[in-house]
């Protein structure tokens, strides 16, 4: 197993790729909330933990938190993000 970090910015449709969005606009969701992302990860059956009081490195003034997810070694991080986005739409 390996861990991946999911910042809300990674799937936010309001962000550009330069601002940290990792998925394409077609998959991205508008203003994703940490709790909503956690709910989707839980429904996917993955282990996770939430870190609420952390700020995204490119925006240290904004406390948004992140989710640490345990995934299989051969799992694609981008595919996990896309699955989360699909279930949020």
Curated annotation (Swiss-Prot):
A molecular function (GO) term: 7S RNA binding
GO cellular component, one term: signal recognition particle
Family annotation (InterPro entries): Signal_recog_particle_SRP19, SRP19-like_sf, SRP19_arc-type
Protein name: Signal recognition particle 19 kDa protein
GO biological process, one term: SRP-dependent cotranslational protein targeting to membrane, signal sequence recognition
Encoding gene (name): srp19
Subcellular location: Cytoplasm
Family, similarity comment: Belongs to the SRP19 family.
The protein's assembly and partners: Part of the signal recognition particle protein translocation system, which is composed of SRP and FtsY. Archaeal SRP consists of a 7S RNA molecule of 300 nucleotides and two protein subunits: SRP54 and SRP19.
Protein role: Involved in targeting and insertion of nascent membrane proteins into the cytoplasmic membrane. Binds directly to 7S RNA and mediates binding of the 54 kDa subunit of the SRP.
Pfam families: SRP19 (PF01922)
Keywords in alphabetical order: Cytoplasm, Ribonucleoprotein, RNA-binding, Signal recognition particle
């Amino acid at each position: 197993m390996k861990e991946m970090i999911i910042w809300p910015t990674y799937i936010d449709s309001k962000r550009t790729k330069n601002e940290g969005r990792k998925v394409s606009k077609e998959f991205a969701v508008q203003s994703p909330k940490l709790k909503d992302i956690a709910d989707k990860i839980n429904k996917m059956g993955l282990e996770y933990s939430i870190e609420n009081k952390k700020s995204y490195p490119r925006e240290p003034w904004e406390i948004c938190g992140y989710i640490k997810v345990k995934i299989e070694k051969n799992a694609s991080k981008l595919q996990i993000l896309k699955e989360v986005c699909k279930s949020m739409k």
